[in-house]
């Protein structure tokens, strides 16, 4: 059984700040808890939630945390890798020194090895941690909710709601503080009832892009997923990045891939405008990669 340090000890260690939101002990709290699947603790950020959990696992410098991602590329967010590396080693392969398994559901797309990794974690009696920062209320093809297989799950509130900060640690044990954060309490209370609409609009905008560029899409059609980006495979990434000022692009994984954020609060006409630009560019240059 993994035990989380009491708040007083965490404060003494200067580890992080966490909040017990008394003022959302109501329908919003219960609804959020039902979606996440267990009681939860709210932190100042998702990274702070990771720090609190890794600190509690009491790993040594020779211990390793296996990090595995949906895309299985070399890229891992420094929010995860650098945070864990402050306490122990990180690895992309399973070894005799593996003391925890950390699954990253890239951009809300489910890791395909959930069940296998659960079995490995159980066999080794080590914790399985799911990073659902981009995958709130996403499900895999088997109807399994992301965050429900692991012993612990991590969420990032700004990636769920249009708010400034906040993270969630959910699991078998949780921290409660005598402190409260009224901003987070108010924001969660306001936005939790709108979760269904947020998910619906994000998926709708994703599907707008997918219908036009399914052949070039890095990821599959979203059915039960709640995708945070649309991935496009193209050799003309430099030109495409320059042609639409209203959408922020990123290239952090593979040089010929771009990721277009799927914003639940953006009008569909913005994505329709982007699609027109992409289609015009593809027709004129004929160099969108053919799969």
Regions found by a protein language model. Name each.
Residues 1-45, 52, 56-60, 96, ...:
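Conserved PLP-binding active-site segment in aminotransferase class I/II-type PLP enzymes
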Residues 5, 9-19, 189-192, 199, ...:
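Conserved glycine-rich beta-strand-loop-beta hairpin in the small C-terminal domain of fold type I
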Residues 27-34, 39, 44-123, 127-137:
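PLP-dependent aminotransferase-like
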Residues 47-49, 71-73, 106-109, 134-136, ...:
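Short, solvent-exposed loop/turn segments at secondary-structure junctions
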Residues 49, 65, 105, 131, ...:
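Generic structural signal for small/hydrophobic residues in well-ordered secondary structure
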Residues 131, 240-244:
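Glycine-centered flexible beta-alpha turn that most often forms the glycine-rich phosphate-binding loop
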Residues 148-179:
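Active-site PLP attachment segment
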Residues 231-235, 250-277:
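Conserved PLP-binding active-site segment of the aspartate aminotransferase-like
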């Amino acid at each position: 059984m993994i035990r989380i340090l009491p708040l007083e000890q965490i404060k003494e260690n200067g580890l992080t700040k966490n909040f017990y939101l008394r003022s959302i002990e109501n329908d919003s709290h219960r609804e959020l808890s039902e979606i996440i699947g267990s009681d939860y603790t709210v932190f100042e950020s998702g990274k702070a939630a990771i720090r609190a959990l890794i600190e509690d696992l009491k790993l040594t410098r020779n211990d390793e945390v296996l990090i595995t991602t949906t895309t299985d590329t070399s890229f891992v967010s420094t929010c995860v890798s650098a945070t864990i590396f402050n306490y122990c080693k990180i690895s992309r392969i399973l070894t005799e020194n593996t003391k925890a398994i950390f699954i990253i559901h890239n951009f809300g797309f489910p890791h395909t090895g959930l069940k296998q990794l659960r079995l490995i974690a159980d066999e080794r009696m080590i914790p399985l941690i799911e990073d659902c920062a981009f995958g709130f209320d996403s499900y895999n093809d088997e109807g399994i909710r992301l965050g429900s297989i692991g012993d612990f799950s991590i969420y990032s509130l700004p990636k769920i709601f249009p708010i400034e900060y906040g993270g969630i640690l959910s699991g078998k044990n949780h921290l409660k503080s005598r402190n409260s954060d009224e901003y987070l309490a108010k924001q969660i209370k306001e936005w939790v009832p709108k979760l269904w609409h947020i998910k619906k609009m994000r998926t709708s905008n994703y599907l707008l892009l997918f219908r036009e560029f399914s052949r070039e899409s890095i990821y599959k059609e979203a059915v039960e997923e709640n995708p945070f980006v649309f991935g496009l495979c193209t050799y003309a990434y430099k030109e495409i990045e320059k042609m639409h000022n209203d959408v922020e692009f990123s290239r952090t994984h593979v040089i010929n891939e771009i990721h277009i954020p799927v914003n639940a609060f953006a009008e569909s006409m913005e994505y329709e405008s982007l699609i027109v630009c992409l289609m015009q560019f593809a027709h004129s240059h004929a160099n969108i990669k053919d799969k």
